[in-house]
Design a protein with these regions (language model features):
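Single-stranded RNA-binding surfaces
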Residues: 1-256
């Protein structure tokens, strides 16, 4: 069924309605001041390492330093995927052997600041796409647990073929197929893979050229999530009441 998307934008709030045959099927609202930090990627600077707590405070340019626990450090566990149970249960590598004060560290917010507590961080980066989640530092190919078990292996084989060899130019990384990607075509999945890898390339490039305490990647706002998640072959029109935001959407669509 064909759909129309109506967008009302103001500096304080964005509202999106998805219509089918003139009837509202979905309504999304995002208030600017209530946007969280989860998903944002920063180039942080280690401010303090606390061996007793197996954690570190990271300055990411916010009012309060953010918190990084050893369990959220990439490479904290010596075991590799597929290792036996004894290796998987091996102790974590102590945080003081992995990070040091003054070190620049790429981190992602996994929990928003609450009260007097700063944001919680991870060095294990994940980037959400329309149908996939990209794990650029991993090689795992996962399938949503909500997809029937009988279909997962075939989907995993498809994903491995579409992702290509890890040593290919622009290749590498792991993916998780989200539930809404179960019936996606190869072309749709390949498009999402390309978008996610391009996003990661931009993040890496920014991490080289920007100083510590810089924002490298901000999770998409509602307008861009509309383009990523809602616009498809059945979309016959998008109506937006802001010329400036219309130009931003055009630029986003052309770039990705």
């Amino acid at each position: 069924m064909q759909q129309d998307i109506l967008i009302n934008w103001s500096p304080q709030e964005t509202r999106v309605a998805v219509l089918e045959s003139g009837a509202v099927q979905e309504l999304h609202v995002e208030r600017t001041l209530e946007r969280g930090l989860v998903g944002n990627v920063y180039l942080g600077k280690v401010a303090r390492v606390l061996p007793g707590m197996q954690s570190a405070f990271i300055d990411i340019g916010l009012e309060r330093a953010a918190f990084l626990h050893v369990a959220d450090l990439l490479g904290a566990h010596p075991a590799v995927r597929g290792a036996n149970s004894e290796e998987r249960d091996a102790p974590l590598v102590p945080i003081e052997k992995q990070v040091f004060e003054g070190q620049a560290l790429m981190v992602q917010v996994i929990k928003d600041p609450i009260g007097t507590k700063g944001a919680r961080l991870s060095t294990q980066i994940s980037i959400a796409g329309r149908m996939l989640v990209f794990l650029p530092q991993d090689d795992h190919m996962g399938i949503s647990q909500k997809i029937p078990l009988a279909q997962r292996e075939a989907l995993r084989l498809r994903m491995n073929a579409l992702a290509g060899p890890p040593d290919a130019p622009g290749g590498g990384g792991g993916f998780i197929l989200r539930t809404n990607g179960e019936d996606a075509s190869d072309a749709e999945l390949a498009e999402d893979i390309a978008y996610l890898r391009k996003t990661w390339a931009r993040i890496k490039d920014a991490s080289v050229h920007l100083p510590p305490q810089s924002l490298l990647h901000q999770d998409l706002d509602l307008l861009k999530r509309v383009m990523r998640d809602l616009v498809g072959e059945l979309t016959q029109s998008i109506r937006l009441d802001s010329r400036e935001q219309f130009q931003n959407l055009l630029a986003f669509g052309q770039e990705f």
